[in-house]
């Protein structure tokens, strides 16, 4: 079952995630509602400890909620086993993180193709080159990571996420290790990918200026969404 074109591809209602810390209950998320659709770029803003990573882990099906309902691409997440959550992620989601996680002994093209190997899909170099072209790295395909700038390494990581043709791209603090110019270039790339591919792109950041380049901006504080605004991309 997949979400209909006009329906949310991610829908969360009263989403809560609590943890035990000794005798204390920590409310990492405390009642979050979200409707996220294909073809939009969404930023989740908030300081460290606000619940951004916890929320992203839930939206990514890397964790399950303590309470509330969460449906991803038509699949209810609550009550599923780790294997079942992996099935929801596989072929639906791509991930980009603050750290690039590129293998130093492989070329850029080979690093990108690792995602296909993990998903047990055939590797076609022409498809790899097309993805590298989209992220502006076609001329770096045979380079090793050590020959790239920080911004170029993050572009390679984005290409690796895109090669599996995800419907949803989750980026957790993707510009945290980049300078301001490179960070803005990455957000510009994200915007173009949303337009070209029609994907849902969810990005977390503590950088207000970058966050407002999205279509919609959600601000988290103490595990709650305290503000929803239109971004400059809307």
Task: Kindly give the residue locations of the regions a language model identified.
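H-loop (His-switch) and adjacent beta-strand-loop-beta switch element
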Residues: 217-229
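ABC family nucleotide-binding domain
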Residues: 8-220
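Residue-level detector of flexible, active-site-proximal loop/helix-junction positions
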Residues: 84, 224, 232
């Amino acid at each position: 079952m997949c979400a209909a074109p006009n329906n949310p591809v991610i829908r969360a209602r009263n989403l809560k995630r609590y943890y035990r810390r000794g005798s204390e209950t920590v409310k990492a998320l405390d009642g979050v509602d979200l409707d996220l659709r294909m073809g939009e770029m969404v930023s989740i803003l908030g300081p460290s400890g606000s619940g951004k990573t916890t929320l992203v882990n839930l939206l990514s099906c890397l964790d399950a909620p303590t309470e509330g309902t969460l449906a991803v691409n038509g699949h209810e997440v609550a009550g599923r086993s780790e294997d079942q959550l992996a099935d929801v992620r596989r072929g639906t989601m791509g991930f980009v993180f603050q750290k690039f996680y590129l293998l130093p002994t492989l070329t850029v093209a080979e690093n990108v193709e690792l995602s296909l190997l993990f998903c047990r899909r055939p590797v076609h170099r022409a498809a790899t080159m097309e993805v590298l072209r989209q992220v502006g790295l076609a001329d770096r395909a045979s380079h090793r990571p050590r020959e790239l700038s920080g911004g170029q390494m993050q572009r390679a990581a984005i290409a690796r996420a895109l090669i599996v043709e995800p419907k949803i791209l989750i980026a957790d603090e993707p510009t945290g290790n980049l300078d301001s110019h490179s960070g803005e270039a990455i957000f510009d790339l994200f915007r173009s990918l949303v337009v070209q591919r029609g994907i849902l792109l969810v990005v977390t950041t503590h950088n207000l200026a970058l966050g407002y380049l999205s279509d919609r901006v959600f601000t988290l504080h103490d595990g709650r969404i305290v503000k929803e605004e239109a971004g400059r991309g809307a």
